[in-house]
Regions:
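Alpha/beta enzyme core
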Residues: 1-174
Length: 174
């Protein structure tokens, strides 16, 4: 892992994240990954090594235990992942409610700052698909620094723009 991270740094990367992550997997498959040494602990180890190498670290965490592990590993930013992003044409269907997200994000935040009071905590994923959703959670959480966008920043806006543009072309009268 150290060699791989050094190569990334040498070609200009300044930070890393544990994605894809086993944190999105549950059930027997997750148990099998953990039992065979390919679980979340490997992701924690990668974050620890990356931090030692002075790379910026922004790991996804899914619960208090994982948050504490990543905080102990020295993560710069803890991204509380509340599930695959919903909305859009390929968004996940199964998701927490916004109020459930508030609870999870706050619990993880409270736990990780006990390990490292300086850590930055962001929320991400699940029903947090638009600015209003992120605002809802952020206004109800204490000490959470912001929102970490992925699909909500790159996939969803493109889908909206493509649909609108296609609609306008379809309106052309011949």
């Amino acid at each position: 892992m150290r060699t791989f991270l050094r190569q990334l740094r040498d070609i200009g990367f300044v930070g890393v994240q544990n994605f894809p992550t086993v944190g999105l997997i549950d059930g027997n498959f997750r148990a099998n990954l953990e039992e065979t040494g390919m679980g979340y602990e490997k992701e924690v180890e990668m974050i620890r090594i990356a931090r030692e190498m002075d790379l910026v670290t922004t790991p996804y965490v899914f619960n208090v235990k994982e948050g504490e592990m990543m905080a102990r590993a020295g993560a710069d930013v803890i991204v509380v992942h509340v599930g695959l992003t919903t909305s859009g044409t390929i968004g996940a269907q199964t998701a927490l409610t916004l109020d459930e997200c508030v609870k999870v994000v706050q619990e993880v935040r409270d736990a990780v700052v006990k390990v490292n009071p300086e850590v930055i905590v962001l929320c991400h994923g699940g029903p947090l698909a638009g600015p209003e959703d992120a605002e809802y959670v952020l206004k109800r959480c204490q000490g959470v620094h912001g929102f970490f966008g992925a699909s909500s920043m790159e996939r969803l806006p493109v889908e909206v723009a493509l649909e609108e543009n296609a609609r306008r072309f379809k309106e052309i009268q011949l």
